[in-house]
Amino acid sequence: MNQTVELNYDMLADKGLRFANYLIDLVLQYGIGYLIGLVIGLMYKHLNVVAPYELITNMGGFGEVVFSYTIMLFYYFIFEATTQRSPAKFITGTKVITFEGEKPSAGTILKRTFCRMIPFNAFSFLGELGKGWHDTISDTYVINVKKYEEALQLKNSFEEIGSGIKE
């Protein structure tokens, strides 16, 4: 039995799911940033570890952007390279695949993740096909897992029927 099926555009996650993914992941990334700040503050207060505290409190606007992008890069790369899904994609039942229906390589996920830093990328999925620039540039797709699995099951059923006829 095949474990992949070629992409059908009906399988693509709709714009509502894509927007939900964006919002959920954004909130979680802010939460991670908050937790990092909390840990640094507690280390400063209780253990007198000064260097990280001074770094965070004196970083300025550019430093805050670098800090945010660093969290974002690690967040998406770790989750999508290992599971094809960010936490939001688990919640909404979506995942990242290639056109052939396969798991993208780590290099492809890294490219996809860096493309998220393109200004206004977060809203680029609002176009006609619901594909963001980070999808288009990395040649990946965000699909509805349920629809994908239904198509895979149908394909495997036809293959079983076909193999039964040959025997």
Regions found by a protein language model. Name each.
Residues M1-E167:
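Membrane-interfacial and juxtamembrane segments of integral membrane proteins
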